[in-house]
């Protein structure tokens, strides 16, 4: 029974929940992080999105079960290995998704709508759209941005269009980082195409150019936001916010260099959670925001 529960938990891929931390961004930026009610709503939103993602992971694993059995590492997944049955997977996915959308409905209608849109795009991406060149990275950026929008509606704060534009550009860049890293490793293996993705090793340079450009545009958007007179009115010492710009600029540059070296073998957001340098940069940004307040 214990092993069964462990496999059921593994099938939900809880390590991927870290991506949903973005839901807390609006809470932090609106200075409501000391409001117990807002914190509770943000935590519920995080749980709803995480369970939605887990339910979709299970559905995707059931869909790809035969392909996973032929893969050197994916064949060890709970469903591909046979440790969990298809019937178990279907039941687990239904239960998890029902709980997820029940939480979303409890929060508020706007949050529920965003979560439904997220689920539709995520499912479409997993089943087919991830094979379409460039559309795949665009959809990944949209999925990350939807987490921020969902967080905004969860805690009922005003939607910042500066934040949305910044999010689109930076997450497009990070999505391309992952693709470029895959292409680099593919080249080392003597292969030319990414299976089921539509990319070839010859796309490496153009993807790098577009991805790094998108990342640096996100820094420009951030700089314009800080320079905006309306932003200055919200802070006692807005000049300290400029500490954020070189921090993000350095981080994006570093991520791209690691990708070119083939050292970015996971989702950049997941990478950041385990990267000491990223934590130092986050601390530096936090100091800048604190001094600005």
Region locations from a protein language model:
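Topogenic membrane-insertion module of multi-pass membrane proteins
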Residues: 1-69, 82-92
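C-terminal membrane-associated helical module and adjoining short loops/tails
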Residues: 2-9, 127, 145-293
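Residue-level signature of transmembrane alpha-helical entry/exit and packing/kink sites
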Residues: 7, 16, 20, 37-45, ...
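Short, amphipathic, aromatic/basic-enriched membrane-interface segments that mark the entry/exit
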Residues: 8-15, 78-89, 106-111, 129-137, ...
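Long, highly hydrophobic alpha-helical transmembrane signal-anchor segments
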Residues: 19-40, 129-161
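Generic alpha-helical transmembrane segments of integral inner-membrane proteins
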Residues: 21-25, 43, 47-54, 91-102, ...
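Acidic (Asp/Glu-rich) catalytic motifs at the cytosolic membrane interface
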Residues: 52-80, 135, 176-184, 254
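Multi-pass membrane catalytic core of lipid/isoprenoid biosynthesis enzymes
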Residues: 65, 70-115, 161-172, 208-215, ...
